[in-house]
Amino acid sequence: MNRVPKGVKKLNFLFEIGLEELPSRYVDEAESNLKKIAEKELKEERIAFSEIESFSTPRRVAIIVKDIAEKQADLDKKSVGPSVEIAYKDGALTKAGEGFIKSQGATPDDVKIIENEKGKYISIEKFIAGKPTKEVLPEILSNVIKKIEFEKSMKWSDRTFRFARPIKWFVTLLGTEVLPFEFEGLKGGNKTRGMRYFAPQDVEISTPDEYVSKLRENSVIARKADRKAEILKSIKENCENDGDVAIINNYLLEEVVNLVEYPFAIKGEFNPDYLDLPEDIITITMETHQRYFPVKDANGRLTNKFIVIRNAPKYSEVVKKGNEKVIEPRLADAKFFFDEDLKGKFADNVEKLKEVTFQKDMGTIYEKMQRSKKI
């Protein structure tokens, strides 16, 4: 919280970075870092605001800075220089004294002598009037973008800048006015974009306050919490008519919520013959490889049904059948390897551990096992 002084005009400021699809694991980090870095930069530049709300989807990260002051706070700055003994010699300024005064953009007449427990020092006191926020924000935004880091980043086109994925657009809206801004050849504006496949057109934003609603009208749910709630609601609606219950793996849920902009749950089925496999093999195959939510019946038994989350605002029979088709070979592979494992004795697998590296320069899993036996 950085309160705006009374009498200072306040506006809301929207900043959105539009991207090619981010990996799911980067989305939360990008949103968090954007908010955290922006907050730090604004405070350092003495720009007051009430709060910052952040947003993210695979194709965008954004913040709305609420009640941002129209200008920087004024600053009374005191800079302490060298000691009097170093700054003066025989009543005249030394090079050290002149250098300090020059570095402060001051004149010898501005020098004051202060005294503390260490002795006497020269100092310069300056009044720095706050600049209009719209003049300071462009540099702040550039710094914010440069300071957002990722585990892996990339260059694209002829850009020298690196980011997790190519940046495609910026929204820079201060109140109802577009803030002039340019970074790596991309200019800020008041147009965002809807969902790539169902609302790919530009979406004009008139004020930051309508950002969330305008995106929703164009098949984008900007808040992660809202997408998660929509996923859980849609899954429940798909299951309750049959008395089924989906298995909600929280790690999978966190991944899926950042894979979609407008989630829609679809229930599919696979060949019930695969239910002869151990339950863990079926669920791991669905969750890890396909990002499906397995489904159990009212008695807690695993069924041949699954829930897939589509990135779309409506149902599609084609998508349902496509996912039903894809899961079959996955389960067939799982069954094949399971059956192969059953053909040999369990003890035979010990020898195979000699072929599996534990860590570089630390031998095999078999050698690790032998070391553990000695402990």
Where in the sequence are the language-model features?
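Long, basic N-terminal domains or extensions that often function
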Residues: 4, 8-275, 280-282
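Structural signal for well-ordered, non-membrane alpha-helices
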Residues: 35, 39, 328, 372-373
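A general alpha-helix detector
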Residues: 234-238, 352, 374-375
